[in-house]
Amino acid sequence: MKKVLMVCTGNKDRSPTAAMLIAEMCAPMWVTSAGTEPWAKNPVNQELIEEADVICVMEDAHRRFIVERFGDSHAEKVVVLDIPDNYVCWEATLVQVLKPKLRAALGLISAHPHPHR
């Protein structure tokens, strides 16, 4: 089973919405979400980064954070969705913007090798 990690800043709006949407779009799949800030609802950590086959981040700043904090070896599994931080959880516009980007990411997720086998 593929493991996907969704990352935004506070793990409050964008990444939880994306995680729920992608779980609906492509079950069965292990999907969780986290934030880059220490105050995030679920702060990103080494274990989450190591376990994920693919890491979908909302902004390039999140990709840089992951590479700087957890190492270059994780850069190849990061997909930047380019979703700015101006939405609230399950906002209709956020869902509308996320869906096509997640569909595109699903193609990358399916093509990504599964290291846990």
Task: Cite the ranges covered by each PLM segment.
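Short polar/charged helix/loop
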Residues: 1-117
